[in-house]
Amino acid sequence: MTQHNHLEHWLAQEREILAALDAGPGPGVATREQIAHLNGLQQMQAMLRGELPYAAIAKTLNFLIVEVDDGKAVFQGTPRPEHLNPVGTVHGGWFATLLDSALGCAVHTRMEPGRGYTTAELGINLVKAITPKVQRVRAEGRVIHSGRQLATAEVRLVGPDGTLYAHATTTCLVFDLPAQSKA
């Protein structure tokens, strides 16, 4: 598949996902009642179908989740002019948030109902600057290990031509979600 074909496929997938997200509840936080009976993969799949809210940060930073599977989450994004640093390349914080989102959601797909996680460590390597010429990038996060207390994952950020822009790893602390109070 050529770079143009990759980009066309990415754009078509993006339009399809955006249509589902726009038809759903929009950005926000799912209620405990909405997700209590769902495992992490089911939650992510429901979000992609527009049945659950998605994270508001995705709208703010112009990226979205485009694919989920067991132990995998793929995000796609396009930095806007307000995401550039003073020298005209994409700010490292944009990279970090996109990478952390793909990593966290990959880990989330392995959570059983009533279990949660938080990022304990995030290591990022920015290997090539993203300039305004880059139309889209994709972050594909994959779980390396998922245990009772810790999970680890890795992610690569690439362009449609396969150019590697960054890679990262995470260690997440896994825990039981607190019971909902009746107050």
Q: What does each model-found stretch correspond to?
A:
Residues 1-183:
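Terminal targeting signals and extreme-terminal segments of soluble enzymes
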